[in-house]
């Protein structure tokens, strides 16, 4: 080991902060023995009472642990039970010292100890048979024993290597080498079992527990004083007084026996005053199926982070916090100071494990996993059994929301959003990350089950957040900057998109959000949320798939208008959705009969109705739209339907959630050459057709959507390669989406109808009207028109529109006309 240290420059670079010198700048001055240290401290000793220091130095010579006073306040005793624990931990760390990075220990001032390794070590369990109970019931003493043990191991290791270096350089070593190792904290992780927040009661006070939750609030980092220097007003004696938990307190007496001073002045700039970094975070519980309670808001608890733990998480992260339960005085209430007896529980964190920061789970090309889940052996067997199903896509799609009849392709789109594609270059600083999360929008008439499918998708997701658009605010979706009542500082509180990081965010009533749409633009494409409020400028991750449901304006979807006109929504937001499904309530005798059977069977409490099928809308297609004709013998929509008389056994949501979490965590598909070629051919054909009619609604966003969804289709079956069949399935789903988006009221595909353009089936009407206005404005030198003038001009041109006000409003939205006042418009094309 010494050779390795010398090879890496141990003597001159490594641990150089731990070698304290009082003399000159040469090497011998940096390595002083104890006699030199006492001489160097002579001036300070003259100010102190000499007799107590002499007794203390005499006692220190008999303590085998040089850092004893850093960890324990009591006097050292060979017969103390603490000594046995320290010796056992010292042997453990000596055996495993090669596994630890000493540079990192020096930089952080702490060492990570795996609790599972401790309990599996035979020697530790023999020497300390009740180590689990000792850590749980007396955590401070046990952690101090671990810290002193690693302190002693590193001190001996450094002294040995320093002696070797001195011998190599021919320096004399008079009275032994003095190595000053600072306080090292033992951080225990992988502690089990996890404690639910609802079980943290008064009985947990002083216990060592582990919790898991989502960070919803992070405070600023502040200095916390642990030791304060006080000067006696009578004799001028300076003493260092400990402040437990950072609570300010005054000494009761002067350390000089002859002095009776009771007045002390704090010396904040004294070298005897010790401060440390301190941060407060708020953890919100993660709700599983067994823990969901109706009508109760999620519980939260505050955690204190100190030293190297500060700045280890941001709002939205899923963290596992291990620490000691403590109490603090409640600052609330109008009672007097002496009457307060209310206490609040909080956790003094010992270790923080951030799911986002586990780099070992990152794939080689920069693909990033979702929130880490734990899988038992039973879960893995169930996942293996699900994957072995013959028609897996059909089973999973029909397990999403069995209560809703039909809409198989819409459910398939939602399931693809749950699985998601692979995010590329997530950790590469030199490249822009490519998002892998698809976004899905469902638009349709009321009463078709959009909200139920949305809630089912959020329930199945390993991490899902469901919000309603008409009650959500812009800050509630993104980030809230709140002011702390006690300190007056601003703190970040995560909104729905940040809490849904690496998961799903379902937004219902998407059309009733008002101006909150603008908050989604950055989150949907850049996968982050930037904040600039009250002097705070920061960016938080929001890598979430957004699935939204919306009702059209007027209550019924008008096919004569585009999606943008039906929703009164901007084109920038609509173009970010990978799939836009249009659900129409069209009367159909066969479909209505099957649907009524299904609803009656569910109401009667029976199993799923035996007859389950849907009848797709048959749209007339002209010869120019051959690319959207289904060429396979049995299309995906037919393969996903449950045949009459066929019995299905849906996967329970709890198990389906585990399956999705496993796929997102461990499966990272790649496109095969055949799949890439199929997607490219489909995209180029779409571009060719859209250019042929003089418009270009097809962009590279559609190609990226195809790639994302194809990767999700392969991930659904736990495959590492996306095949041509996957690409064909995605092309069919995309066709189904486009049939609703680009078809007009006659069922014909019109590529001039972009999602955000005019909804007229014949745009020449608008062009003819604007051309007439141009000629009138040039002739009269006036480009201002009253509404009744516009109506008269349209009547003269014999322009027949169903709603003239909407027609003018459409021209206003597209920038041809500018509304200058009530019923007054200005022509913009002159």
From Swiss-Prot:
Upper classification of the organism: Eukaryota, Metazoa, Chordata, Craniata, Vertebrata
GO biological process, one term: double-strand break repair via homologous recombination
GO molecular function: ATP binding; ATP hydrolysis activity; chromatin binding; enzyme binding; helicase activity; MutLbeta complex binding; MutSalpha complex binding; MutSbeta complex binding
Protein name: DNA helicase MCM8
UniProt-listed PROSITE patterns: MCM_2
Record EC number: 3.6.4.12
Gene from which this protein is expressed: Mcm8
PANTHER family per record: DNA HELICASE MCM8, DNA REPLICATION LICENSING FACTOR MCM FAMILY MEMBER
UniProt xrefs under Gene3D superfamilies: 2.20.28.10, Nucleic acid-binding proteins, P-loop containing nucleotide triphosphate hydrolases
Record localization: Nucleus; Chromosome
Entry-linked InterPro entries: AAA+_ATPase, MCM, MCM8/REC_WHD, MCM_dom, MCM_lid, MCM_OB, NA-bd_OB-fold, P-loop_NTPase
SUPFAM superfamilies: Nucleic acid-binding proteins (SSF50249), P-loop containing nucleoside triphosphate hydrolases (SSF52540)
Modified residues (Phosphoserine): 620
Record carries keyword Zinc-finger: no
Role of this protein: Component of the MCM8-MCM9 complex, a complex involved in the repair of double-stranded DNA breaks (DBSs) and DNA interstrand cross-links (ICLs) by homologous recombination (HR). Required for DNA resection by the MRE11-RAD50-NBN/NBS1 (MRN) complex by recruiting the MRN complex to the repair site and by promoting the complex nuclease activity. Probably by regulating the localization of the MNR complex, indirectly regulates the recruitment of downstream effector RAD51 to DNA damage sites including DBSs and ICLs. The MCM8-MCM9 complex is dispensable for DNA replication and S phase progression.
Keyword DNA-binding attached: yes
Matching Pfam families: MCM, MCM_lid, MCM_OB, WHD_MCM8
Source species of the chain: Rattus norvegicus (Rat)
Swiss-Prot/TrEMBL keywords: ATP-binding, Cell cycle, Chromosome, DNA damage, DNA repair, DNA replication, DNA-binding, Helicase, Hydrolase, Nucleotide-binding, Nucleus, Phosphoprotein
Chain residues that bind ATP: 444-451
